């Protein structure tokens, strides 16, 4: 019998992933990662529900304490990023460094199993021509999570199953009801677990970053108002600025050195190019010459045409066909060729040369 370790969060998606594989004849072992300390009690509820699902399926359940790993790779990453004026994307880093990598290692070392599965909406296939595993968008584009998975390695793709990649969320709910799973009617969780635990990103960050009053200025340096910390703002933000102006104003830059929030009209927030670093080419070999593909610069944004020009230090320059609004340092730029995730990286600040 084929053995698989299924990552269980206690939600309906991972529950159906486990139940479906169990129904297909896999020897399923449930595994839940204990991620958060303190206020993150959503983890406690999730662990209880995950244990219940495993009991319902008649399969073993393991809990792995990854709180220190989560704090080092995610909490510290978020806090330092927001303090420096970027808007970090924790999910892709969490998937690589806290979830998939450690899960697969635990499965191999402790459970003698070389396959893991999760409830993510994405697909994996093997390309015989290139002899590489490819990461693909999910069939359900509304639930597609491939944007958050671009940083996975070939070894992880080889050892991973995404049972939900070929179905819609509605089908997942229906299957959960058919299996009479406890989580069948459980509400949809937040995309970001920290927001679910703390109510908002601002509430979470306020525990780590002290208020620091600064100026909100326009592009000419005219002071329009004040703020209590640049970590409360992100590029493209319009609401919550607390300033009066004859036209809508948006955050176009965060200056951590001067502790300033710089605002302008929508046209001022458009960019025709940007630099992306910390690259991972998940489905193809690293290109040595310019390529023209599509890029997605936010989870919910539309993929748009882009020219990717390799430069030094594991970085590329992105040149957009049309100016793009809200290009945000710290977020991921993920490259697509149709449904195939080619790779991606982190949008850098103009003065950031970090590899």
UniProtKB/Swiss-Prot annotation:
Enzyme class: transferase
Gene Ontology biological process terms in this record: tRNA wobble position uridine thiolation
Cystine pairings recorded for this chain: 94-193
SUPFAM superfamilies per UniProt: Adenine nucleotide alpha hydrolases-like (SSF52402)
Binding positions (ATP): 7-14, 33, 119
Site (Interaction with tRNA): 120, 331
A Pfam family reported for this protein in Swiss-Prot or TrEMBL: tRNA_Me_trans
UniProt subcellular location: Cytoplasm
UniProt-listed Enzyme Commission number(s): 2.8.1.13
Stretches for region Interaction with tRNA: 143-145, 298-299
InterPro entries given in the database record: MnmA-like (IPR004506), MnmA-like_C (IPR046885), MnmA-like_central (IPR046884), MnmA-like_central_sf (IPR023382), Rossmann-like_a/b/a_fold (IPR014729)
Positions annotated as active site in the UniProt record: 94, 193
Top-level division of the source organism's lineage: Bacteria
Reactions mediated catalytically: S-sulfanyl-L-cysteinyl-[protein] + uridine(34) in tRNA + AH2 + ATP = 2-thiouridine(34) in tRNA + L-cysteinyl-[protein] + A + AMP + diphosphate + H(+)
Signal peptide start and end residues: none
A molecular function GO annotation: ATP binding
Keyword Isomerase: no
Function as written in the Swiss-Prot or TrEMBL entry: Catalyzes the 2-thiolation of uridine at the wobble position (U34) of tRNA, leading to the formation of s(2)U34.
Similarity field: Belongs to the MnmA/TRMU family.
HAMAP family referenced in this protein's UniProt entry, alphabetically: tRNA_thiouridyl_MnmA
Protein name: tRNA-specific 2-thiouridylase MnmA
Native source species: Crocosphaera subtropica (strain ATCC 51142 / BH68)
């Amino acid at each position: 019998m084929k053995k698989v370790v299924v990552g269980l969060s206690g939600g309906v998606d991972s529950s159906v992933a486990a139940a479906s594989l169990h129904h297909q004849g896999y020897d399923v072992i449930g595994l839940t990662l204990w991620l958060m300390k303190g206020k993150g009690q959503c983890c406690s509820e999730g662990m209880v529900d995950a244990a219940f699902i495993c009991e319902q399926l008649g399969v073993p359940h393991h809990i792995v304490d990854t709180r220190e790993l989560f704090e080092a790779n995610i909490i510290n990453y978020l806090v330092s990023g927001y303090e420096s004026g970027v808007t970090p994307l924790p999910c892709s880093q969490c998937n690589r460094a806290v979830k998939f990598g450690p899960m697969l290692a635990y499965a191999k070392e402790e459970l003698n199993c070389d396959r893991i599965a999760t409830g993510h909406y994405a697909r994996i296939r093997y390309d015989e021509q290139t002899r590489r595993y490819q990461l693909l968008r999910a069939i359900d584009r509304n639930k597609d999570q491939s944007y958050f998975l671009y940083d996975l390695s070939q070894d992880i793709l080889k050892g991973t199953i995404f049972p939900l990649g070929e179905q819609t969320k509605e089908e997942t709910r229906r299957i959960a009801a058919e299996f009479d799973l406890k989580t069948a009617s459980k509400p949809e969780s937040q995309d970001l677990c920290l927001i679910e635990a703390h109510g908002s990103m601002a509430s979470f960050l306020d525990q780590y970053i002290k208020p620091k009053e600064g100026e909100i200025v326009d592009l000419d340096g005219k002071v329009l108002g004040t703020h209590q910390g640049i970590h409360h703002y992100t590029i493209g933000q319009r609401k919550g600025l607390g300033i009066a102006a004859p036209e809508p104003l948006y955050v176009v830059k965060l200056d951590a050195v001067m502790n300033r929030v710089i605002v302008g009209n929508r046209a001022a927030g458009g960019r025709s190019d940007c630099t992306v670093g910390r690259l991972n080419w998940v489905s193809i070999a690293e290109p040595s010459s310019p390529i023209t593909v599509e890029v997605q610069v936010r989870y919910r944004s539309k993929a748009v045409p882009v020219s990717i020009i390799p430069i030094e230090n594991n970085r590329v320059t992105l040149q957009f066909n049309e100016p793009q609004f809200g290009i945000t340092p710290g977020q991921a730029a993920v490259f697509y060729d149709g449904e195939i995730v080619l790779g991606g990286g982190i949008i850098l600040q103009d003065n950031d040369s970090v590899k």
